[in-house]
């Protein structure tokens, strides 16, 4: 297959151009590559790199820089629901290691487009076909950031997906269609709800399922283990409906994984006669199972409690001893949090 290089730009251009400007320039380069291999009808028809401007705005609103938040300890980001991979190839050009994750059976061209561009660019982007409506396993265990744009409403179980993503990344960009009212004018905005589309109701596409209200999307985000750092809507922000292409509203969000929590109250345990008592509370935040172990005076730790979230009493706290409660993931390979408990002597 013929390889075509994306045009190189000088360091001065990189410093003086916004990421959005660079993205639009690269989109033009990518179209040259695409049309050199297949006719226009073969390729995903919508622009994905125009979203860079919104992603930059979300990042700045949260006091972050788009590329900086992608450069973390895991050395990897992923573009989920990637169409032809334009965003992934753009991020790779800016020094990131990227996975493309999409379902070849629902992707616009069966991921053949992304694979064609990958070969033409001699890219190192990893392309994986994953059915996100299954009990999936992603190809790289942990990511610094995920890009999950325009895909949520194509999934049968958005709750499961967002909860699963919270277990493998710190940051996640999400965009999806939302609606302020039904087609006949009934208001959805005040309620945390989602509208289930008919199979041909929206864009004649039976892979469209759930259109959330603004309040419903924010409730979903909170319930699946995320903090909402920034949020913006574009399109018909006054009278959007679930299916009308002329009344289309999109929400863009920057999410941060909510950290696991572990606490003991009271701590220190008040002095008194007999053993003292504290109540240990925990929450994994992402729906996974956690395990609480306790070590007394530095001795071998023993299992104290387990579960997604809960409380348990420790009614054997003695003065002069130190109790360290340690919160692990389900297979005891990652320490999520810890708290030291003591008892007052008087």
Put a short name on every predicted segment.
Residues 259-346:
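Extended, solvent-exposed regions of the mature portions of secreted/cell-surface glycoproteins
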Residues 130, 231-234, 265:
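Conserved beta-strand termini and adjacent loop/short-helix elements that scaffold enzyme active sites
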Residues 152:
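Conserved SAM-binding site of S-adenosyl-L-methionine-dependent methyltransferases, i.e.
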Residues 135-137, 147-148, 156-258:
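S-adenosyl-L-methionine-dependent methyltransferase catalytic module, highlighting the catalytic core
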Residues 98, 170-173, 290:
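Hydrophobic beta-strand segments of well-ordered beta-sheets in folded domains
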Residues 2-142, 190, 242-254:
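Conserved N-terminal segment of class I S-adenosyl-L-methionine
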Residues 71-73, 100, 147, 201-204, ...:
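A short, structure-level motif marking secondary-structure boundaries and short turns
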């Amino acid at each position: 297959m013929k390889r075509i290089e994306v045009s190189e730009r000088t360091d001065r251009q990189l410093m003086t151009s916004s990421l959005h400007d660079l993205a639009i320039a690269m989109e033009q380069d990518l179209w040259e590559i695409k049309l050199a291999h297949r006719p226009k009808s073969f390729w995903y028809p919508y622009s994905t790199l125009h979203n860079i401007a919104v992603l930059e705005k979300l990042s700045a609103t949260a006091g972050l820089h788009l590329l900086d938040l992608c450069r973390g300890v895991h050395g990897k980001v992923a573009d989920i629901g990637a169409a032809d991979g334009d965003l992934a190839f753009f991020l790779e050009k800016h020094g990131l290691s990227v996975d493309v994750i999409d379902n070849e059976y629902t992707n616009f061209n069966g991921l053949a487009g992304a694979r064609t561009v990958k070969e033409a660019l001699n890219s190192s982007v990893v392309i994986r076909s994953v059915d996100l409506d299954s009990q999936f396993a992603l190809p790289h265990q942990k990511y610094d950031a995920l890009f999950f744009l325009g895909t949520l409403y194509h999934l049968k179980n958005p709750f499961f997906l967002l909860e699963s993503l919270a277990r493998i990344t710190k940051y996640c960009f999400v965009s999806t269609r939302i609606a302020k009212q039904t087609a006949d004018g009934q208001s959805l905005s005040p309620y945390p709800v989602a509208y289930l589309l008919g199979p041909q109701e929206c864009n004649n596409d039976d892979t469209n399922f759930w259109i959330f209200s603004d309040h419903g999307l924010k409730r979903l985000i909170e319930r699946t283990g995320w903090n909402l750092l920034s949020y913006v809507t574009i399109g018909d922000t006054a009278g959007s409906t679930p299916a009308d292409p002329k009344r289309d509203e999109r929400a863009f969000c920057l999410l941060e994984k909510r950290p696991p929590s572990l606490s003991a109250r009271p701590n220190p345990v008040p002095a008194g006669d007999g053993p003292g008592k504290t109540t240990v509370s925990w929450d994994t935040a992402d729906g996974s199972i956690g395990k609480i172990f306790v070590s007394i005076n530095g001795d071998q730790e023993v299992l104290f409690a387990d579960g997604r979230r809960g409380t348990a009493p420790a009614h054997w706290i003695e003065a002069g001893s130190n109790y360290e409660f340690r919160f692990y993931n389900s297979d005891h390979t990652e320490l999520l949090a810890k708290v030291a408990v003591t008892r007052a002597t008087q």
